[in-house]
């Protein structure tokens, strides 16, 4: 299992809340057969399970704080091990949020092949999130929480991008345009991996 994980393509997908990274991940799954693992989805399903861990996570998320690293890594690892035999690769969505998370991931799981940076401006992200909040029922899609989430995101993510840029594995896509125009940029980067 360990060896298989180390040989598998692992792509970190980083982008702010509302950047459209989730949508891009869905399209990558359809076209390339990767497995999409969103730390947010893993956490939310844990919360809705009503487990003790889920209740703790719920309190943390409602305050707009980040969930402990150990918890996230355990959940990611379990999900990857479950799929390693059938997947063409993994999209790790919303991770790492800080350099230490990336280093810990590499120690415990494997090295990323690429970091895909889905980059949209704060106004665009806010508008998309407010629109999503009308229909999603998510506790964290309101204006005040969005502002906090964006601040948290920028503060945490800039050092991560810088860290992986030194290794030459960051690929940035401009996420201001339509879903398809963003995806064509994504495909250019993924096709280069083959």
UniProtKB/Swiss-Prot annotation:
Disulfide bonds: none annotated. One of its GO terms (cellular component) is outer dense fiber. It catalyses: a ribonucleoside 5'-phosphate + ATP = a ribonucleoside 5'-diphosphate + ADP; AMP + ATP = 2 ADP; dAMP + ATP = dADP + ADP; dATP + AMP = dADP + ADP. ATP binds at residues 18-23, 132, 177. Residues 131-141 are annotated as: LID. It comes from the Eukaryota. SUPFAM superfamilies: P-loop containing nucleoside triphosphate hydrolases. GO terms for molecular function: adenylate kinase activity; ATP binding; deoxyadenylate kinase activity; nucleoside diphosphate kinase activity. InterPro entries: Adenylat/UMP-CMP_kin (IPR000850), Adenylat_kinase_CS (IPR033690), AK1 (IPR028582), AK1/5 (IPR006267), P-loop_NTPase (IPR027417). AMP binds at residues 39, 44, 65-67, 94-97, 101, 138, 149. It is found in: Cytoplasm. Its EC number is 2.7.4.3, 2.7.4.4, 2.7.4.6. Its cofactor is Mg(2+). Monomer. Consists of three domains, a large central CORE domain and two small peripheral domains, NMPbind and LID, which undergo movements during catalysis. The LID domain closes over the site of phosphoryl transfer upon ATP binding. Assembling and dissambling the active center during each catalytic cycle provides an effective means to prevent ATP hydrolysis. It is linked to Anemia, congenital, non-spherocytic hemolytic, 3: An autosomal recessive disease characterized by hemolytic anemia and undetectable erythrocyte adenylate kinase activity. Catalyzes the reversible transfer of the terminal phosphate group between ATP and AMP. Also displays broad nucleoside diphosphate kinase activity. Plays an important role in cellular energy homeostasis and in adenine nucleotide metabolism. Also catalyzes at a very low rate the synthesis of thiamine triphosphate (ThTP) from thiamine diphosphate (ThDP) and ADP. NCBIfam families: aden_kin_iso1, PRK14527.1. Belongs to the adenylate kinase family. AK1 subfamily. This is Adenylate kinase isoenzyme 1. It comes from Homo sapiens. The gene is AK1.
